[in-house]
From Swiss-Prot:
NCBIfam families xref list: PRK00026.1, trmD
Organism: Brevibacillus brevis (strain 47 / JCM 6285 / NBRC 100599)
PANTHER family for the chain: TRNA (GUANINE-N(1)-)-METHYLTRANSFERASE
Catalyzed reactions per annotation: guanosine(37) in tRNA + S-adenosyl-L-methionine = N(1)-methylguanosine(37) in tRNA + S-adenosyl-L-homocysteine + H(+)
Domain of life the protein comes from: Bacteria
Name of the molecule in the record: tRNA (guanine-N(1)-)-methyltransferase
EC category name: transferase
Gene Ontology cellular-component terms listed: cytosol
GO-annotated biological processes: tRNA N1-guanine methylation
Length: 243
């Protein structure tokens, strides 16, 4: 997979793309990162990439020419997904991460200032994505979130690919609790079932705890889920435990 990032602050990505899972994925040549300062594509001798909005108002607006020149110069006739990070975009979720992970080439545009010239949205971008109902200084941090969630889904990116499958949201449920040594710490004990070596019982416990946690913290996820007979049985047990 190739990932291109267009930003006015390329230095923000240096540590992120060379560390942890992203750095290892790059070393394994599972992903090829390219970070470009789109100010370099300004025709102004001062590198201007923004201007005042028509009709008045506060703030500055990113001009279309530098971004069109930068992105089209890279992609040519190819049509990769060009993603604009902005609070007006569709809410980001795991299913979208899985969809983007299937692409061979992704382009991210990270903006600043008041906003983008609307022609960028209409004629250059294929996707607008938001990571939440709040405003950040720019799109860089949001792009990092999306890139991390996509790259970790690439085969070979994680030491144990099962981790990606079992993560919260991948199954439609929040993830079950994890424990490691020691078996007892300050009087708090690891559940006996996890020490039993009985794999079927362990899997049942994990599913039940995922359901318990999802029901308590994100009941909306259960409403969207096609429940199996086993899930229905375990949910009934959870209801009985309340009585």
């Amino acid at each position: 997979m190739r990932i291109d990032i267009f930003t006015l602050f390329p230095e923000m990505f240096t540590g992120v793309l060379s560390s942890s899972i992203l750095g290892k994925a790059s070393e394994k040549e599972l992903v090829d990162f390219h970070v470009t300062n789109f100010r370099d594509f300004s025709e102004s001798k001062h590198g201007t990439v923004d201007d005042t909005p028509y009709g008045g108002g506060g703030g500055m607006v990113l001009k279309p020419e530098p971004l069109f020149r930068a992105v089209e110069g890279l992609t040519g006739e190819k049509k990769p997904r060009v993603i604009l990070m902005c609070p007006q975009g569709v809410p980001y979720h795991q299913k979208l991460a899985e969809e983007l992970a299937q692409e061979e080439h992704l382009v991210f545009i990270c903006g600043h200032y008041e906003g983008y010239d609307e022609r960028i949205r209409e004629h250059l971008v294929t996707d607008e994505i938001s990571i939440g109902d709040y405003v950040l200084t720019g799109g860089e941090l949001a792009a990092m979130v999306v890139i991390d969630s996509v790259v970790r889904l690439q085969p070979g990116a994680l030491g144990n690919q099962t981790s990606a499958v079992e993560d919260s949201f991948s199954t439609g449920l929040l993830e079950y609790p994890h424990y490691t040594r020691p078996a007892e710490f300050r009087g708090w004990k690891v559940p006996d079932v996890l020490l039993s070596g009985h794999h079927a019982n362990i899997e049942s416990w994990r599913l039940k705890e995922s359901l318990r946690r999802t029901k308590a913290r994100r009941p909306d996820l259960l409403e969207k889920l096609a429940l199996t007979d086993e899930m229905k049985k375990l949910l009934a047990e959870l209801e009985q435990e309340k009585k």
